[in-house]
Amino acid sequence: MFPANWTSVKVFFFLGFFHYPKVQVIIFAVCLLMYLITLLGNIFLISITILDSHLHTPMYLFLSNLSFLDIWYSSSALSPMLANFVSGRNTISFSGCATQMYLSLAMGSTECVLLPMMAYDRYVAICNPLRYPVIMNRRTCVQIAAGSWMTGCLTAMVEMMSVLPLSLCGNSIINHFTCEILAILKLVCVDTSLVQLIMLVISVLLLPMPMLLICISYAFILASILRISSVEGRSKAFSTCTAHLMVVVLFYGTALSMHLKPSAVDSQEIDKFMALVYAGQTPMLNPIIYSLRNKEVKVALKKLLIRNHFNTAFISILK
């Protein structure tokens, strides 16, 4: 087969989960459920943050950004797969594949930057409460959020530009359900050492370094909490950090497990199932964690329900 630049390929074919015909319907149902919960949960968090003035704080600005990128990340990966399952085609155009790969890289990278910024926000709120309004003013918060998006989008562009010139070995069959960059590299028949180096550098910048910043922030937070004399004060401080810590563990745990998986013959099959967790489960659980663990969100929802004359029986469930 003659090598060709992958931009010359008009259509790519996904193998998806066709190797597992007995569980395809189950996978489709689970993915559809996860996607719907992701959409509803994250739209709910964004909406309630906008509607309730008490939630117009740095923490909820960052949380709204997290919800927004979770919607885009999940939509870029799951919605084409669900559409292909219904239509039975399992194909994607070059432009669609490139867009899907870029969105996946950009949203994942942005979250890697945004999570340590959220940890820093919690650090300032607990360790420097009197200076918090000055340090985390509106301008600073907007700059942090914009910087996170710019960093994620630029690193994704660098990775994309390193892959586009590569030549394929006449093969356009992707052993995945999405245009994941590692799955695309499996089709390349030229040396990919430069691309692998670029990806390694970006991975180090976006995984271990943010994790280190988060650990440092929470080390200071823990030290400050232990110095709080009242039990109520400690409980309140812990509650403001628990939800973020759960999201951090969920996100980085999944990301690291994808990078530290065993190098086996069927590693591509492992990649597909782990990508489902990364693209479906994590964005789905984020709004659930923040809603159930956050008293302010519950209070805001109660106010919204009362304002719109909803059934008081439903309000009592939130108590």
Curated annotation (Swiss-Prot):
Keywords: Cell membrane, Disulfide bond, G-protein coupled receptor, Glycoprotein, Membrane, Olfaction, Receptor, Sensory transduction, Transducer, Transmembrane, Transmembrane helix. It holds the Pfam family 7tm_4. The chain crosses the membrane at residues 26-46, 55-75, 100-120, 140-160, 198-217, 238-258, 272-292. It is found in: Cell membrane. Disulfide bonds join 97-189. GO terms for biological process: detection of chemical stimulus involved in sensory perception of smell. The keyword Glycoprotein applies. Residues 1-25, 76-99, 161-197, 259-271 are extracellular. It is a multi-pass membrane protein. GO terms for cellular component: plasma membrane. Residues 47-54, 121-139, 218-237, 293-319 are cytoplasmic. GO terms for molecular function: G protein-coupled receptor activity; olfactory receptor activity. Odorant receptor. Belongs to the G-protein coupled receptor 1 family. This is Olfactory receptor 13F1. It comes from Homo sapiens.
